[in-house]
Curated annotation (Swiss-Prot):
Cysteine disulfide links: none
Motif 'HIGH' region location, chain numbering: 12-22
Stated name of the protein: Methionine--tRNA ligase
Cofactor(s) the record lists: Zn(2+)
HAMAP family documented for this protein: Met_tRNA_synth_type2
Organism expressing this protein natively: Thermosynechococcus vestitus (strain NIES-2133 / IAM M-273 / BP-1)
UniProt binding sites for Zn(2+): 127, 130, 145, 148
Lineage: Bacteria, Bacillati, Cyanobacteriota, Cyanophyceae, Acaryochloridales
Amino acid sequence: MSPHFSLTTPLYYVNALPHIGSAYTTIAADVLARFYRLQGYQVRFITGTDEHGQKIERTAQQRGLSPQAHCDEIAAGFQALWQQLNIHYDRFSRTTSPRHHAIVNEFFQRVWDNGDIYLGQQQGWYCVECEEFKEERELLEGRRCPIHVNRTVEWRDERNYFFRLSKYQQALLDHYAEHPDFVQPPSRRNEVLSFIERGLQDFSISRVNLAWGFPVPTDPEQTLYVWFDALLGYVTALLEPEDEPTLANALKTWWPINLHIIGKDILRFHGISWPAMLMSAGLPLPEQIFVHGFLTKDGQKMGKSLGNTLDPFALVAQYGADAVRYYFMKEVEFGRDGDFSETRFVTILNADLANDLGNLLNRTLKMAWKYTDGKVPNVQGAAIPREHPLRQLAEHLSQTYGQGYRQLAFHEVCQQALTLARAGNKFLDEEAPWKRYRAGETAAVAEILYCVLESVRLVAYVLAPIIPQLSEAIYGQLGYSIRFNGSIAPDLLGDRQAQWGVLPASQPLANPEPIFQKLLLPATVADSP
C-alpha cells in the first residue's frame, strides 16, 4: 500500500476575493502535493474557505447580499483562481456545509464533556478584521490593530463561553520540547514558545448578537467563535463523500495531518489554540506547521490605501500560471518575507526559463535534427563516465532535490536545477558539436547531444512540481507522451525519472519549438523611474 501524505493551506476568509498572499500559500502547498504524488504517495491536499463570523455578516450586508450568497460568490472566486494557477487540490472545505456543522457539534461535545468549556465574562479590545480579542500591549497608537493597522479595535463586554487554554500550557510546552520541528522555521517556533511561556489565558469560543455562525450546542442563544469552527474544517475535509459526518469517519485514514502551511499572521491560532483544542478532545496533533512570511511589492507593504495591491487574477492572465508559480517559489525563500517587483519578475523569467532552460533545449534539438536524424542520439546514458561534468551535476541534483522539497526549500531546488541547465549551455558552447560534426567526430557529437538532452530532461522532471506545464512541454519535445497534470503515469512514480540515463537512445524527437516565450514589461512599468 502506498504511503499517505496530507497537507493543508489555511481555510481562507471570504471577506474578499483571494489576494496574492493566498495564492502564494496555495502554490507552495500544490508544489509539495505534486512532489509527493510523483514520489508515489497517496496525497490528500486540502484547501477551502472559512465562511462564518461578524466580518462576513457585515460585508454581506454592505453588499446587499445574504451571508450565504456572499460566501458562495467568494468561494467560487477562490476556486477559479486555483484553476487558473493549475492548483490540483483534493478537497475544498467550506465551513458553512451541513457536514461540517455535524463535525463541529461532535467536537464541541467532546471538549465540553472533558470540562474544558465554561461560561464567563469577556472584556477587552476586539478586532473585527481578525475576529479576535487583542491585549492592550499589542495595540498600536490610537488603539489600532497591529495587523490591520488602519482599523481601530472595539471595546467588548459580554458573557461568553470560554475554552480552558490555560489548562494546556504545560502540555503544549512539553509537546514543543518533544517535537522540536512541530513549528518551523525555528524563528516561528521560538515566537510561539515565548508567547506560551508568558502565560496562556483562556479564550472565548462564542459570541452574542451574531446570527452568522453555528449555534453553541449547549446554548443556542450564543454563536460559536469563527476560529473554533474554522480550524475543524481541516477535519471535515477528510470525510469521504459517502461517509456519515462523524469524527471517527473523518479521522480513520488521513489523520493526523502531516503538514499545515500557514502565514505568520495566524500562527497563534494554529500553534497554540488548535493543538490545545485537539488535546482536549483526545486527538493526535498535526505532525508539523510550516509558517511563511509576508509579501511586499517593490519593497512596500501592500494595501488598498497605498494603491499598490497585486491582483493574482491579472498576474496569471498576463504571464501564465507557470511563470507566477516559478517566480514565487524561486525568488522567495519559503519561511521568510519576500518581495514582488514586476521588473525583476520579467527579468528572472526571461533569464531562467526562456534563456537558460528553453534556449538550451531548442538549440540542442535543432542540432539533433541536423546531426542525429531527429532522434535521441544512439548513446546509452549508463555508459557515460561518472566523472562527466554534466553527469556529476545531474547525479548530485537527483540525490538532493528530494530533501529540498521535503524541507520546503523550493528556492534551493530551483537553484540546483538551474545550475545543471547553465552547465549544459556552457558545455555545449565549449564542446562546439557543430565543429566536431564537420570534423567527422560523429560519436563525440552524439555523446555531447545526449548528455545535454538528458540534463534538460532531468531539470524538467525535478521542476515539474513547480512548472508542470513547461515540464510537460519539454518531455513532449523529447519524444515522451508523459503528462504531469491529471493522473500520473506509473513511469513517473518514485525516483526512476530522477536518475541519470533515463532518456531512451534513438527515441524520435518532436520538432523544436520555444517552450517559453520571452516576456515583455508593460509600458507603464517599463517607463516608470
